[in-house]
Curated annotation (Swiss-Prot):
Cellular component terms (Gene Ontology): cytosolic large ribosomal subunit
Intrachain disulfide bonds: none
Protein name stated in the entry: Large ribosomal subunit protein bL19
Gene: rplS
Similarity remark: Belongs to the bacterial ribosomal protein bL19 family.
UniProt xrefs under SUPFAM superfamilies: Translation proteins SH3-like domain
Keyword Ribonucleoprotein: yes
Pfam families for this protein: Ribosomal_L19 (PF01245)
GO process annotations (BP): translation
Gene Ontology MF terms in the entry: structural constituent of ribosome
Function of the protein: This protein is located at the 30S-50S ribosomal subunit interface and may play a role in the structure and function of the aminoacyl-tRNA binding site.
Keyword Transferase on entry: no
Organism: Wolinella succinogenes (strain ATCC 29543 / DSM 1740 / CCUG 13145 / JCM 31913 / LMG 7466 / NCTC 11488 / FDC 602W) (Vibrio succinogenes)
């Protein structure tokens, strides 16, 4: 049993953020605040969500994109972090797995995910 004060604090933290519902296979654009000296800017990271794990304020998600020279880049973001400026859902993917780690071994056409038709 968790402390009720901690639970109420976490619910307040979650209610403040405006984050869309997404799952593994969806294409997301994440705006991350970056502090360089005394300046703050927002850097976008766009890719496929390959996993969502955890619950409550400890929830994290992993985004994978193909960088320069076809090098895969993965970043793990805490969902309710203050450094996240925005999370935008670009495409809803059609997948049958909760964790898409098999995409690490694929490249080219086999690494693509079909879009969910409505």
């Amino acid at each position: 049993m968790r402390n009720r004060y901690i639970e109420s604090f976490e619910k307040a933290q979650i209610a403040d953020k405006n984050i869309p519902q997404f799952k593994a296979g969806d294409t997301l654009r994440v705006g991350v605040k970056i502090q360089e000296g005394d300046k703050t800017r927002v850097q976008n990271f766009e890719g496929i969500c390959i996993s969502v794990r955890g619950t409550g304020t400890g929830k994290t998600f992993t985004i994978r994109k193909m960088g320069a020279n076809n090098v895969g880049v993965e970043r793990i973001f805490p969902l309710y972090s203050d450094s996240l400026e925005s999370v935008t859902l670009l495409r809803v993917g059609r997948v049958r797995r909760a964790k898409l780690y098999y995409l690490r071994d694929r490249s080219g056409k086999s690494a693509r995910i079909k879009e969910l038709r409505k």
